[in-house]
Amino acid sequence: MSKRAYNFCAGPAALPEAVLLRAQSELLDWHGKGLSVMEMSHRSDEFVSIATKAEQDLRDLLNIPSNYKVLFLQGGASQQFAQIPLNLLPENGSADYIDTGIWSQKAIEEASRFGRVNVAATAKPYDYFAIPGQNEWKLSQDAAYVHYAPNETIGGLEFQWVPETGDVPLVADMSSDILSRPIDVSRFGMIYAGAQKNIGPSGIVVNIVREDLLGHARSLCPTMLDYKVAADNGSMYNTPPTLAWYLSGLVFEWLKEQGGVEAIGKLNDVKQRTLYDFIDASGLYSNPINKADRSWMNVPFRLADDRLDKPFLVGAEARGLLNLKGHRSVGGMRASIYNAVDINAVNALVSYMAEFEKEHG
């Protein structure tokens, strides 16, 4: 096998090489059963054992309390933008949303189709370069829930704190930062995460839902989108995305082997500091985000001259540094350094950036 590239893609993102090799070894013959996971009945003892272990490993990693259900559902976070209000927002109720970037805005736009949405805070006055402090928020006393995105992958903002919402359930889109450092699940009513950044391949979404929030779906909510139906059926009301579920389980196993979320969080801290410290000391590269709000997972940066963007990307690809082009809506560069992107990848990127600056700075 030729040397694997360093993949800085925002999603679908890098997967641990050990997970890929394990999946490769089991692809044609899972545990001597003579068939692939892709060919198994989702109701077979074999796949049920895979699903059960994946859930337990995730519970162990995040210390999920027993009064929370863990769901493995089809689709991604964008589907949750509709599924959440269909399950949690009463017909005549309202929900509070926090706007810190493009993904927050997509959630707001979709929820507005199903009821009243109060944008309780927005980063717009800060040009989305900083997160408004909670003293600036205007939360509703009667909100059904408060929704926010702890990490905005495109803008590169990340909450370094958990909002206080009292008795109002806090709903978090953790698609891009789940499992990147320890969290207290009990502070949330619901956590959801599309898999293709820090969990596994695309096509599956993980929902961690407090039990008292189940059973309140609207009458018009499709059966397939009802969280209680999913919970009552072990996430198997219909045939689930079995391969993605299995691969996610392998990632959970790998994370436990690395020492769990606390250990991976320390590694992620080293990675993000290595990259930001280099950018801040550079004369060619810059990051516009307020330092207290910088994302650990998604690091956007610009070159002083946009005309250097193309040669920078060409040189990066020649060195096996892939998918560094920034999102089309903001331009520049973006390095996504999720759990599976190790410090060697970050060091290789910094080394190339220094070399490029020496030639073009």
Identify the residue ranges that each predicted region occupies.
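Conserved N-terminal alpha-helix of the aminotransferase class I/II PLP-enzyme fold
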Residues: 34-80, 87, 102, 110
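PLP-dependent enzyme catalytic core of the Aspartate aminotransferase-like
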Residues: 1-5, 318, 331-361
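PLP-dependent aminotransferase-like
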Residues: 78-146
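Active-site C-terminal subdomain of aminotransferase-like
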Residues: 16, 195-276, 359-361
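Active-site phosphate-binding strand-loop segment of PLP-dependent enzymes
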Residues: 11, 111, 122-178
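A glycine-/small-polar-enriched, mobile loop at the entrance of the PLP active site in fold-type I
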Residues: 4-55
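Conserved PLP-binding catalytic core of the aspartate aminotransferase-like
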Residues: 285-316
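Conserved active-site segment immediately N-terminal to the catalytic lysine
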Residues: 171, 185-196, 205
